[in-house]
């Protein structure tokens, strides 16, 4: 359990822990936090600015945070990586050259050994494995997703090819800017999140966003993104290849070899045909126009359970 406080626009999290001198005595991961601080301070005395650069670089590119709705790099993982590689630029170069399942082991706990044999597989599912320098049984980067790992590789390469201050500045998702850039086929939704703990709210927003993205696949989603001000506003956007679906679609039924199921399918659907060993029906599309499709989609019960309200919808 932990407590969240807000004081003069700052968010504080108060987490009770037990005092320990060895990680083996910890009851949970937060008990080890003071040991993390000791290790980081010992190994990064001349690297504070490099750590700040790494954290801001990741923040600006939406890669910072191990929360479930972000699945990025925690501050501690970035500190370990900077300490291990020696500078911000060396860290980026190392990231670019890393393969999936790369292991970073600053204390050489597993030198000459196979980490994938030594540790439980459940701890090694992330694309980058960072052995916690104060707890050799832990992968500090376990929360990292493949998507965020690959994104860091991309932006690191872009930055090193052409260093620019813009890489350290957060880009606001703006309807005006997106509309100016895309010109058409844009869906921009403004929502009010539910209240609660940050990680819970963020995860609900992510689920809402992924739900909409899945449903819009029919219109061929080209680009997408979302943002949240951690207060009362979240925005989702999708750029699509088309604004309208055909009035009639081919809906797949069971394979022809499933005779009973095919018979039931024919009984339920009037206009059927066979193709590639399967039966299909021709169904009328209820909402072929993008705008009507989106407005109907926003009425879905699943979406209403994930957000407090939809404030505005723009389809251009």
Regions found by a protein language model. Give the residues of each.
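Short beta-strand element of the conserved SAM-dependent methyltransferase core
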Residues: 3-5, 189, 238-240
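Extended, charged low-complexity segments
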Residues: 227-316
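Conserved nucleotidyltransferase catalytic core and NTase-mimicking acidic/glycine-rich helix/loop elements
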Residues: 45-229, 246
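Conserved catalytic core of two-metal-ion nucleotidyltransferases
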Residues: 1-25, 216, 223, 227-232
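A short beta-strand motif that forms the metal-chelation/ATP-contact edge
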Residues: 12-16, 81, 235-241
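A broadly conserved detector of short glycine/acidic/proline-rich loop/turn motifs that flank catalytic sites
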Residues: 9, 16-20, 110, 134-135, ...
């Amino acid at each position: 359990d932990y407590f969240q406080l807000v004081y003069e626009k700052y968010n504080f999290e108060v987490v009770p822990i037990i005092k320990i001198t060895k990680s083996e005595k910890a009851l949970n991961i937060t008990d080890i936090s003071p040991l993390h601080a000791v290790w980081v301070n010992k190994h990064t005395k001349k690297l504070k600015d490099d750590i700040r650069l790494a954290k801001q670089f990741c923040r600006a590119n939406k890669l910072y945070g191990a929360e479930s709705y972000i699945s990025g790099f925690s501050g501690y993982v970035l500190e370990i990586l900077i300490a291990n590689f020696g500078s911000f630029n060396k860290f980026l170069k190392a990231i670019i050259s890393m393969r999936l399942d790369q292991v970073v082991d600053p204390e050489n706990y597993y030198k000459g050994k196979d980490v994938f044999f030594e540790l439980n597989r459940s701890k090694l599912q992330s694309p980058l494995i960072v052995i916690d320098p104060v707890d050799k049984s832990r992968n500090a980067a376990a929360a990292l997703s493949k998507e965020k790992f690959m994104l860091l590789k991309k932006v690191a390469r872009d930055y090193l090819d052409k260093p620019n201050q813009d890489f350290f500045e957060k880009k606001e998702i703006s309807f005006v800017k997106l509309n100016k850039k895309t010109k058409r086929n844009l869906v921009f939704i403004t929502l009010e999140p539910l209240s609660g703990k940050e990680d819970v709210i963020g995860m609900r927003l992510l689920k809402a966003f992924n739900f909409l993205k899945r449903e819009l696949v029919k219109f061929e989603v080209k680009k997408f993104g979302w943002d949240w001000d951690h207060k009362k506003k979240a925005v989702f956007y999708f750029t699509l290849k088309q604004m309208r679906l055909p009035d009639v679609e081919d809906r797949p039924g069971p394979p022809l070899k499933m005779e009973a199921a095919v018979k039931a399918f024919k009984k339920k659907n009037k206009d059927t045909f066979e193709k590639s060993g399967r039966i299909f029906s021709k169904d009328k599309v209820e909402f072929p126009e993008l705008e009507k499709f989106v407005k109907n989609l926003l009425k879905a019960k699943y979406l209403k359970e994930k957000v407090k309200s939809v404030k505005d919808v723009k389809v251009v």
